[in-house]
Amino acid sequence: MQFRSPLRRFDAFQKTVEDARIKTASGGLITLVSGLIVIFIVLMEWINYRRVIAVHEIIVNPSHGDRMEINFNITFPRIPCQILTVDVLDVSGEFQRDIHHTVSKTRLSPSGEIISVDDLDIGNQQSISDDGAAECGDCYGAADFAPEDTPGCCNTCDAVRDAYGKAHWRIGDVDAFKQCKDENFKELYEAQKVEGCNLAGQLSVNRMAGNFHIAPGRSTQNGNQHVHDTRDYINELDLHDMSHSIHHLSFGPPLDASVHYSNPLDGTVKKVSTADYRYEYFIKCVSYQFMPLSKSTLPIDTNKYAVTQHERSIRGGREEKVPTHVNFHGGIPGVWFQFDISPMRVIERQVRGNTFGGFLSNVLALLGGCVTLASFVDRGYYEVQKLKKN
């Protein structure tokens, strides 16, 4: 005798014998359609589970006193590299003058072609005596302002010119300096004055408000005043102007293009026909942290920025675009990037569109709903067909 379990009375899934089951063509069609719908729903849920989305959060920036890297690549088609300088100033008083060690200057022909690097240096050829030792060149009264690595000595034309600039003395004919005459400074400059220049590199600045600028002439700091000797630029007004192309400008380490839009100033082109012109870019820089989905990849701390622009003639007068606005007279021609630092930090986290548990819950719920709906449709259609036959 077969044992009957007492649990049978709790069975909510009652079965019918095989002979009592009826299979119809409409039921088969509904089953196939339901199966396709289930496959589609499961596929959509899987795509949603695997999808990576970005979650943003804004907090007060906890870091302070850090330094920040500025990466740039800018071309000036109508100014030779010889008279362009890159300087950095900030509100703390830090002044980085005529930065060379992290900035490369590439000479360009009037047609924009790169000129051989072998011809780059003007006024930077150190004199060597017959016995192989470096000579101590005359500073022509500016020995107190000689380069730190050669105290009291100006061994190159650049060293003499720098010393005079620091002393705030005017330079007349550079051929009066032996170093400049020996290096054929004037002749080489004459050959280069129709060229253009590309500047690319990296600047390290304090994480505080300040500016970096690219302007003609050697710069000096006279008290609170920042001064450029623009005589070489002004003497060739017909040849020079501040037209420029910003190929790239970013603050901090770069991000992959897949997670970062282009920087606002990338691809900016400005053209002007007069030499006495000044461009200013006012930049608001926000700390930005990118946290990738993979736990094995470290977060990337960098910066994003927004920018507004202003341009004017240093001669002053009314603006062409807005005649009601009057610009003041004065200033230094050049391209100035005034940056300010926001106290906020934006955190962007990559997360899955759903958890695995959520994925399973959604799939099971949709499966149950789809099967139940299909059974209702099949049962209803079957009953209607049966009534028609009767």
Curated annotation (Swiss-Prot):
It is a multi-pass membrane protein. The chain crosses the membrane at residues 27-47, 356-376. Belongs to the ERGIC family. GO terms for biological process: endoplasmic reticulum to Golgi vesicle-mediated transport; intracellular protein transport; retrograde vesicle-mediated transport, Golgi to endoplasmic reticulum. It holds the Pfam family ERGIC_N. Keywords: Membrane, Transmembrane, Transmembrane helix. One of its GO terms (cellular component) is endoplasmic reticulum. This is Uncharacterized protein C24B11.08c.
